[in-house]
């Protein structure tokens, strides 16, 4: 959702058409409003993905994100109130990450009413502005096979790759290993058996990718 006007027009057309299908989308947190969300729900929207990134306002500024943590939290709360599921997209290990910002993110993901969380590992891809900031114009090839978003190939000052990996697991577990999340996914699988199969396929695919990444990075 970048333009509320266009989203409103689209939702009204969907409602008027009588088409019966569901859809999901991505959105900025600073463009969403309760009225728009209610209309999106009526038009069939079942999930919105937000690039929340981190629980630290300091890191959000470094990333040139327009929103602050408080605005992100408000958007997620509004979305949940409208009956739409929220997927939070986060990143760990961005330049400036510290143990304190990790704890802020951990507290943030536990606090907001997300239904699914995606945490990626910061990867400075060649050609990107952040890559030039870190390495200059030289292209490194010592960890090329590991630059897939599933491995830490760089660590901020004062942290190590191994420590980032531990924080990565801690953040994910702090969100998913809560009783209410277990109950949520259990009820979802009972209501929609195909969802359980999809989760199993995703889990096996993720495990296979991790094994390949580990073998290639050795």
List PLM regions with ranges.
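A structural motif corresponding to the C-terminal lobe/cap of the Radical SAM core domain
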Residues: 4, 10-193
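Acidic catalytic loop of the alpha/beta-hydrolase fold
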Residues: 1
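Membrane-proximal basic amphipathic "stem/tether" segments
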Residues: 174-218
């Amino acid at each position: 959702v970048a333009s509320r006007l266009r989203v409103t027009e689209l939702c009204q057309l969907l409602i008027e058409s009588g088409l019966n299908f569901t859809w999901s989308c991505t959105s900025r947190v600073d463009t969403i409003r309760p009225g728009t969300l209610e209309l999106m729900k009526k038009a069939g929207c079942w999930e919105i993905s937000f690039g929340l990134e981190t629980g630290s306002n300091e890191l959000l500024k470094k990333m040139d994100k327009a929103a602050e943590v408080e605005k992100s939290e408000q958007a997620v709360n509004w979305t949940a109130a409208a009956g739409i599921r929220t997927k939070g997209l986060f990143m760990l290990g961005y330049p400036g990450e510290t143990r304190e910002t990790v704890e802020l993110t951990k507290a943030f993901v536990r606090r907001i009413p997300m239904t699914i969380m995606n945490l990626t590992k910061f990867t400075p891809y060649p050609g990107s502005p952040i890559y030039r900031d870190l390495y200059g114009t030289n292209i490194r090839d010592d960890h090329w096979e590991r630059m897939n978003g599933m491995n830490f190939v760089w660590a901020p000052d004062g942290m190590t790759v191994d420590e980032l990996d531990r924080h990565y697991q801690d953040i994910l577990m702090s969100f998913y290993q809560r009783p209410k999340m277990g109950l949520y996914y259990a009820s979802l699988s009972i209501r929609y058996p195909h969802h359980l199969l999809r989760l199993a396929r995703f889990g096996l695919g993720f495990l296979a990718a991790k094994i390949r990444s580990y073998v290639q990075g050795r």
